[in-house]
Amino acid sequence: MLENICINFKKVKEKTPLVHSITNYVTINDCANMLLAYGASPAMVESFDESYDFAKLASCIYINLGTLTREQEQSILMVCISAKNNNIPVVLDPVACGAVPHKIALIEKLFEIGRIDIIKGNIGEIKSLAGYNAKTRGVDSIDNGNDSIDACISLAKKYKCIVAATGVKDIVTDGKRTALIENGSKMLTLITGAGCMVGALTAATAGVEDDKFIATITSILSMNIAAEHTEKEVIGPGSFKVKLIDNIYLLKENHLRKEGKIKWI
């Protein structure tokens, strides 16, 4: 399984997947730079008039609900319809869905009329979508309960998609296979946009890999190992954020192969 992850990582470098992103305004530049550093090609296209047609060109689509506007919402609907019609995978980051019921209604509609292949959120967001009690503070989760794995598996089965929940240990599941990723750095919680950047990387790996379970593990493991490298080189969150992009750029297959800490459940 780890070898498949390394192959997926290498394919991003070889194929330069085009990631069509409709993301939030807080981290849009971070996501674009992270994609470039990883070997992908970012396109931050959110205009309603362009969204359906541009989505046809993408290797994968990344949707982030962090600063949702009315035009973004309409564009997201069109992008998901285009993805369904043109067989383009979609990664969804349901930012703050636990705090904003309208976002949950939108997500239900996206599954109804469009396509979502991967949901990547923090554990609070995932538990909210799965119908579990969740502890959130705005866009942040303060929940790492014992039922986290059950919630992820339940949501994956409900929507027949990959679910990834980030936390102290990151959970990835397709409802049958489940992985716990134990790499990471506490410094990721001290910068804005770490989760958004992981979502963008997930779209890059999913754009070149048929097995979206593997693709999701690849992206999260990449970010976490790069974060471990970065933590050793910096003195605080400001330098950490800048150096993190450098270490994503410098990441090699052997780092994943030798340093990856994954438990298969």
Curated annotation (Swiss-Prot):
Pathway: Cofactor biosynthesis; thiamine diphosphate biosynthesis; 4-methyl-5-(2-phosphoethyl)-thiazole from 5-(2-hydroxyethyl)-4-methylthiazole: step 1/1. GO terms for biological process: thiamine biosynthetic process; thiamine diphosphate biosynthetic process. The keyword ATP-binding applies. It catalyses: 5-(2-hydroxyethyl)-4-methylthiazole + ATP = 4-methyl-5-(2-phosphooxyethyl)-thiazole + ADP + H(+). Keywords: ATP-binding, Kinase, Magnesium, Metal-binding, Nucleotide-binding, Thiamine biosynthesis, Transferase. Its cofactor is Mg(2+). One of its GO terms (molecular function) is magnesium ion binding. SUPFAM superfamilies: Ribokinase-like (SSF53613). ATP binds at K120, T166. InterPro entries: Hyethyz_kinase, Ribokinase-like. Its EC number is 2.7.1.50. It comes from the Bacteria. Substrate binds at M44, G193. CDD domains: THZ_kinase. It is an enzyme of class 2 (transferase). The keyword Transferase applies. It holds the Pfam family HK. Catalyzes the phosphorylation of the hydroxyl group of 4-methyl-5-beta-hydroxyethylthiazole (THZ). HAMAP family: Thz_kinase. Belongs to the Thz kinase family. This is Hydroxyethylthiazole kinase. The lineage of its organism: Bacteria, Bacillati, Bacillota, Clostridia, Eubacteriales.
